[in-house]
């Protein structure tokens, strides 16, 4: 069975207060002066003090084996802050640190270890505040207002490096080869790891490690590094340093799912919802010039305009990609929303998903069998539901203690205001009619004979995504739905968590003393007119799921308060994030893909045209991480997701899966 939680570090603290691994019988850092050793071995061994001011790019990428207590990272972060303060006009503006950890510390142990270095406290406290729960895969932490990015990959480094997306190939400027001593942890120090380090290192990339073991030096030389010995720190006689003097072009591992970025840094985003807003922030943080074109007179008038939306992960025991995306997207979303410097109505009150019938009970039982961390999800028995949620349902279920609700409309509006303060240009009442290539740019034709030219375009306009010739064949569909707004009652006012059943019910929003109950589902419809049938059905589904609950029968929808919206969805429930694929060229180039995979060319796409769509009903959960994924791709930066999950987000995936099996593909 696949496990979705990671085993935490098994450690104790010795007489000096130094953490020691019980499993590896080794210290996490030197008893003498771990901080100075880090500065000498890793910062000095990679010559970072000299390289930072001379770096010709805005981003410096460092990768590390073994995050441990984060001492190396915190020391580096402090040094980077000092560099930026001393060289504010330098080309280098941002730091990206990638680290792998098989047995992450608990937050409590991390905080205890950090007490050793009071001079690192300002940085350590920020790390502790965002420390992720023990889920496998990549956890992206945005620190110092996005100037420092930390990618924590939880799992075995030798397994994870084989699962990385090609976006990391030849991107690493410096390697910190750390971890428990080779004699204590031989399973990590393998030729497989050394080869992966070489693959990820950019030309001129360096490495440093505390060990001088001969097999390590020979293995790194075999991988392609030029190695040399250097005086070790303190009582250690020698350590190793290396450089990747030259690299060869690397073939794409799965060219049919290849992701291409852009060398340009000027973009038009089409849309006005949460996808557009969050992508704008992610691109602005990377130095892009961003313009946004919204068809409406104001933002969040489409699917992002609801008063309350639930935030919790979409999990399925039988869908690996779904679990990888939504479990890590959920934790990223919580960190992201918590540090946003804008106001929006929200309450992280928890979400309880109830088993109201045999089918839903079976689904919940399968989710609970996935060995999920308790911070993510826990079982709740029927007799405990009332205590947790505040209302009686006579149903058992699964609780997401870090879930809750937020106001999507307010979030979208205020994020766009924040983005405007950072340079975003917004054009309202610009309905895009079509777009075409002109002189290596995109010519945008809007209703009313308005035109604009942009280097790069992102289509993030929800269910209208398929209205252009470049996207008309995409396998997406519209879903119209109505959310009912109901006044609170004394019984409903007791509701403490979001309830999910064959619908959902939110606790009251203190701003308006109303709850949201929804939502109707009409696949293939774009009708946004109020429906009395939908209003009554929203109420009836609640009553049908909890027939013994008197409070459910007292729900009042008679005032006809509701909001109707249209979502964009796919049949596999995953967003479409990446290059807009060229349908006709895909069919031609991949006509014999099943027999000629070794000869496949890179996925046919429209140059400098991207899409961010099909968020379905879980956009509040997936949008923050997907915005980060797309912005990283467009900027040719490391992506915070493994290759197979990125393939599951590729807009061409449904076509390619059929072509790989030798099956015919139809448009739409």
From Swiss-Prot:
The keyword Transferase applies. Keywords: Cytoplasm, FAD, Flavoprotein, Methyltransferase, Multifunctional enzyme, Oxidoreductase, S-adenosyl-L-methionine, Transferase, tRNA processing. GO terms for cellular component: cytoplasm. GO terms for molecular function: flavin adenine dinucleotide binding; oxidoreductase activity, acting on the CH-NH group of donors; tRNA (5-methylaminomethyl-2-thiouridylate)(34)-methyltransferase activity. InterPro entries: FAD-dep_OxRdtase, FAD/NAD-bd_sf, MnmC-like_methylTransf, SAM-dependent_MTases_sf, tRNA_MAMT_biosynth_bifunc_MnmC, tRNA_MNMC2, tRNA_S-uridine_synth_MnmC_C. Its EC number is 2.1.1.61, 1.5.-.-. Residues 1-245 are annotated as: tRNA (mnm(5)s(2)U34)-methyltransferase. It catalyses: 5-aminomethyl-2-thiouridine(34) in tRNA + S-adenosyl-L-methionine = 5-methylaminomethyl-2-thiouridine(34) in tRNA + S-adenosyl-L-homocysteine + H(+). The keyword Hydrolase does not apply. Its cofactor is FAD. It is found in: Cytoplasm. It comes from the Bacteria. One of its GO terms (biological process) is tRNA wobble uridine modification. Residues 270-668 are annotated as: FAD-dependent cmnm(5)s(2)U34 oxidoreductase. In the N-terminal section; belongs to the methyltransferase superfamily. tRNA (mnm(5)s(2)U34)-methyltransferase family. HAMAP family: MnmC. This is tRNA 5-methylaminomethyl-2-thiouridine biosynthesis bifunctional protein MnmC. It comes from Shigella flexneri serotype 5b (strain 8401). The lineage of its organism: Bacteria, Pseudomonadati, Pseudomonadota, Gammaproteobacteria, Enterobacterales.
